[in-house]
Amino acid sequence: MSTPAQKALLDALSQHQAYLYRASSQSVNELLKQFGSISNAQLLRLSELLEELTDTERKALQGLNFSGKGRASKRIEEIKASLNEWFDSLSVELSADFEKSAITLAVYEAAYAVKLFGEAAVAISGAEAYETIRKTPYAGGQLVDHLFKDIAASLRKKVEYVIRDGISQGQTNQQIVQRIKGKREKVDGGYSYTGGMLEAERHVIERQVRTARSHVSTSIYIDTYKAAGYEYVKVVATLDGRTCKYCASIDGDIYSIDDPARPRFPVHPNNRTTYVGCDKDGNIAGQRPFVMDERKVKDIPKEERKHLIGQLDANTSVGESKV
């Protein structure tokens, strides 16, 4: 394999991964903004409700099953209702916002995959494919449809634990809320809340969203290969220090495209391993064209085109680039 061909592939893959990362960052930032807005409003309400509790009600709250059916005092019932509203809003609103960006990604990746693999006659509807993708498990059984419902349920349990624990330790309402929201500190010239439960949850949301978007991209590629007539796929792992041992060990493995035992990437959070269509021996005949950029050709500066547009050997792999 010639060095120019290897470099062309690596540059092309790097450009596309950089684009996907930027697109995912935009989606993540929009979701985190919504997450912060909803959570801050509900925490303010929770703080007000905690201030209204009597000593007897605080003691009752310490041993409360928040999801229980039993009736409590009016003020405790208001706290339960406030938590219901908080986490229902997170589940519904974040899911809706993510779906919009995921459909946009699916449409883009469908067009990109056709262009990348030179299958001009293949037509994949990204929007239609997403309806199947959202109900297809990935990363050990996660479903896109349940992504934010699961995140909200997990966070709710943590918040309930902090309320109980804080009261049992004699913490003030302000201290309890601070454990959830964090402490306001100066960060990078501005102010932000750090060290709280919500900061940790932002990292969870970012990781889960990036993984879900990877699931969308990989699924679209598989649909494209099937439509193009490929019967086999080959594992393509990004081989660097961040690649897990499992993905590195199966790089280059070949599977029937319809094999139910075939790994469904992403198999773990932040997984960058995917598939390429091939024959039963793992080869893709001839040359394949690539235009590895979201911009139109006319909008790409001439000095960048040599890395983004051209022809390369269809059998060049990421693994071979290490040779």
Label the predicted regions.
Residues 1-192, 283-323:
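N-terminal leader/targeting and assembly helices and adjacent pre-domain segments
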Residues 191, 196-292:
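Acidic, glycine-rich two-metal-ion catalytic cores of nucleic acid-processing enzymes
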